[in-house]
Amino acid sequence: MRRHSAQLIHHPAVLPWLGANFWSRTGGPLMWRDYDPKTVRAELRVLHEHGLTMTRSFFYWPDFHPQPDHVDETLCERFRDFLDAHTEIGMGTVPTFIVGHMSGENWDPAWRGGRDLYEDVWMVGRQAWFVSQMTRRFKDHPAVTGWLITNEMPGYGRIYQVDPPSSDVVTAWAQAMCNAVRAAGGTQPVSLGDGAWGIEVTGRDNGFSLRETAEYVDFVGPHVYRSDTDRPRQHLRAAFECELASVTGQPVVLEEFGLSTDTVSDRNAAVYYRQTLHNSLLGGATGWIAWNNTDYDDLWDRSPYDHHPFEMHFGITDSIGAPKAPLLELAAFAEVLKDVDFAHCRRADADAALVVPAFLERGYPYSRPADRPLIFTSLHQSYVATRAADLPVGFTGRPTDCPATPPCICCRPPASSPPAPGVSSSAAPARAPRSTSRSAPASTPGPAARGSTTWTGCSASNCSSPTVSPSPSRTTSWR
């Protein structure tokens, strides 16, 4: 069976994405108040010198959107300088719009007034307005290589994910946000920034469904920090979640991963990064964004670090900008990607499969939500066993979950609409009907690319076309 290995192709100069989530050491989440152009450039230079191609950046929502109908133009100019700093050294960045949750604390704009972020119509409108305003300002800057709607919205929209919204509600909200990007002229790939913590990956229904939102996004971005009592399970956890997150057939970017060096030695931090990077590569990830760029020792008396002090030391550089062990591992990984000509690689086909029980995400009669963690744990252990045996496997659903499917999207006639401006592409495939099968993609890229394609590759077992690459000169398979 063909295994998932879809890649983004829209911005070759900074692809594959290998980067860091970025807050400057001058302020953490409040960096835009304390913005120091010289320090930011020094921080970016260290990342670039170690092979990183991009960052993920953040519009701290209370500061950038201080009034319902007002954007802080001073902070926007500082952000533009931040973008210029990326361009100066050939890096890109993925701005994140709705940043109300960060590192163990939630922050609201003062005007929110307790309104629901998903179901209050006025509040949804204000979010969409902010997304469109920021997109219009920065969509044409060459440093912008993608967009994320939120940071970990499941933990912000409903704190602790208590009383989560329905999938219909979240999908409508996601549609409004992604459509705001497109209506404002943003052509770069977009995703939600939710962490891929929904039912297809975790078995927990928090309203965020990869299948249901696939129509509107261009890639999936797992956030993986989970620890385990067993070293092989821990080293393979991110890879396992990337495999599950590939259910839509879209590129999987490991959008957040890392660890605090308050809890581990430098040597073991390096081991964790090395294992996570290489295992997730073999698990189908095609982008990696570490958490995060620096330590924050000088911010010990500010929130969130005064109450979550371990959050100060997730950095891949220390608080004066010197590389830590994880950054050296990222640099070595960058060399591996270069040596294997990663843009022209795809995963080797597999002769074996792990069956993902439909009970993980379906509410069958006499099934209980409490059963799902056991399904997840058993499947995780099965995956670890196959990797220990050096047995390449694909993920699939039960045969009864996989009725005869129409030709996969790679095999369909291309759409006739012209490519969207600024997006590298061949013509887009028509959207396939949503499927419950893990053997075929649930959808094509989102409206990002109605008439354009921002990614390449297919995981469908019924695909009759070879994997498409931006340059067809060579395709290398890996296990």
Q: Whereabouts are the PLM-identified features?
A:
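A short, well-structured beta->alpha microelement
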Residues: 200, 380-403
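Aromatic-rich peripheral "rim/lid" segments of glycoside hydrolase catalytic domains that contact
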Residues: 127, 292-351, 357, 364-365, ...
